[in-house]
């Protein structure tokens, strides 16, 4: 419904901003990162927006750059992650830090954020890692470092790490991952973890 707002910044706090456009004031929820980069009240401002609607609530979220908006929407695509938690994640770390934690499979970086537990952190990495690799190559890849395509060893390590973070014993995780790769090679990390999870549940 709203792609962006261009107007005058009226007020701003760590969590909200009010922007006047043609005499109408729009209240937007923002991350602390966006808040820290806003101009002083009375200045012109341009914010990308996300309009979130549910049965009992309508909310408008504002972002200074498209990268933050894109990551916000990716976070919303995860089961159990709503806009409040997505903004908390963006407030806890920069976009680059979040992407690096996801690509490098470091859930401990994410569950240091208020409201993000171990299982949520693992789910974020599991569901977004391949998407982040496709849309946002790491700085090392941009600089001509080895391709982001994972080696077999790295693929296994990442899948096992995701499963152990979800609470499965390491030995069981390794066995399930290896068995899946024997029968279905060429999987991404996300696909490998999902297939291994299904196999482990079937054996319970």
Curated annotation (Swiss-Prot):
Keywords assigned by UniProt, alphabetized: Cytoplasm, DNA damage, DNA recombination, DNA repair, DNA-binding
Source organism superkingdom: Bacteria
Chain segments carrying region Domain III: 151-204
Residue ranges, annotated region (Flexible linker): 144-151
Keyword Cytoplasm part of the UniProt annotation: yes
Compartments reported by the entry: Cytoplasm
Gene Ontology CC terms: cytoplasm; Holliday junction helicase complex; Holliday junction resolvase complex
Region annotated Domain I, chain positions: 1-64
InterPro entries in alphabetical order: DNA_helicase_Holl-junc_RuvA_I (IPR013849), Hlx-hairpin-Hlx_DNA-bd_motif (IPR003583), NA-bd_OB-fold (IPR012340), RuvA (IPR000085), RuvA_2-like (IPR010994), RuvA_C (IPR011114), RuvA_C_sf (IPR036267)
UniProt KW DNA-binding keyword: yes
SMART domains, alphabetized: HhH1
UniProt GO BP: DNA recombination; DNA repair
Region (Domain II): 65-143
Functional description taken from the UniProt entry: The RuvA-RuvB-RuvC complex processes Holliday junction (HJ) DNA during genetic recombination and DNA repair, while the RuvA-RuvB complex plays an important role in the rescue of blocked DNA replication forks via replication fork reversal (RFR). RuvA specifically binds to HJ cruciform DNA, conferring on it an open structure. The RuvB hexamer acts as an ATP-dependent pump, pulling dsDNA into and through the RuvAB complex. HJ branch migration allows RuvC to scan DNA until it finds its consensus sequence, where it cleaves and resolves the cruciform DNA.
UniProt subunit comment: Homotetramer. Forms an RuvA(8)-RuvB(12)-Holliday junction (HJ) complex. HJ DNA is sandwiched between 2 RuvA tetramers; dsDNA enters through RuvA and exits via RuvB. An RuvB hexamer assembles on each DNA strand where it exits the tetramer. Each RuvB hexamer is contacted by two RuvA subunits (via domain III) on 2 adjacent RuvB subunits; this complex drives branch migration. In the full resolvosome a probable DNA-RuvA(4)-RuvB(12)-RuvC(2) complex forms which resolves the HJ.
Entry's free-text remark on domains: Has three domains with a flexible linker between the domains II and III and assumes an 'L' shape. Domain III is highly mobile and contacts RuvB.
Family: Belongs to the RuvA family.
Protein name: Holliday junction branch migration complex subunit RuvA
């Amino acid at each position: 419904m709203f792609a962006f707002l261009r107007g005058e910044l009226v007020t701003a706090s760590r969590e909200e901003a009010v922007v006047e456009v043609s005499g109408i004031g729009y209240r937007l929820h923002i991350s602390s990162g966006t808040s820290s980069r806003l101009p002083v009240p009375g200045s012109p401002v341009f914010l990308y927006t996300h309009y979130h609607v549910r049965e009992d609530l309508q909310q408008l979220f504002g972002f200074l750059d498209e990268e933050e908006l894109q990551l916000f929407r990716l976070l919303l695509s995860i089961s159990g992650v709503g806009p409040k938690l997505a903004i908390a994640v963006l407030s806890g770390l920069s976009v680059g830090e979040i992407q690096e934690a996801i690509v490098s499979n470091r859930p401990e970086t994410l569950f240091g954020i208020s409201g993000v537990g171990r299982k949520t952190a693992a789910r974020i990495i599991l569901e977004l890692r391949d998407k982040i690799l496709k849309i946002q190559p790491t700085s090392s890849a941009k600089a001509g470092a080895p391709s982001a395509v994972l080696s077999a060893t790295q693929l296994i390590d990442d899948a096992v790490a995701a499963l152990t973070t979800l609470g499965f014993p390491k030995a069981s995780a390794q066995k399930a991952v290896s068995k899946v790769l024997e029968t279905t090679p060429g999987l991404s990390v996300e696909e490998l973890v999902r297939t291994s999870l299904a196999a482990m549940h079937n054996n319970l």
